[in-house]
Amino acid sequence: EEVVRRIDVPPSPARNIEMTVHLLQASQQPAVAELPAQLQPVIKQLKGVFTYQGFQLLDTALLRVREGREAAVTGTLSYGKDQNADYIFRFRSARLGSEGQPRVIRIDGLQFEAGKPSGRGGPLRMNAEIDVREGQYAVVGKTGIEGADKALILVLTAKVVE
C-alpha cells in the first residue's frame, strides 16, 4: 500500500509560458512618439549597433501557451499612412530550459512573417531557435523594409507562469 501511494502521485500541472512580442520599425528619421519605458534599454542597445535614429512600436502581441506546445498569433502592422500589412508570429514549442536563476526559456521553431508596406515582392521573414533568459528582452532579428533606410526588428520577452 505504501508503494502504491508513492507511485500513484497526480502529475504536476503543466506550466505556461507567456511571451510578449514587440515589433519595431527603425528608420533614419528621429522618432516622433515615445516608446514604452521597458523598451528603452533595448533601443539604446540597438542605437549602439545600427545607425538608425528613430524607432517606432508597430505592434505588441501577447501569447500564453502550455509548456512544450505550439502557438501562433496574427495581426496587422501599420507602417504609415495607407501602408498596412498582415503578419504571423509562431513557434513549434516553448519550454523551460534550465531551473537556475535566471531561468532560461527555449523557443524552438520560431517563425515570423510579415508583408511589405508596398505589398510588392516576397514577405519579410525571420526563423530562429533561441534561448531567452526569463524576464529579459531579446532582439530576435532585423530585416530591411524595402531598402536600407528602414528595418523591422522583432524583440521578445518570455516568462514562466505557474
Give residue ranges: language-model regions.
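Outer membrane pore-forming secretion/assembly proteins and partners of Gram-negative envelopes
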Residues: E1-E162
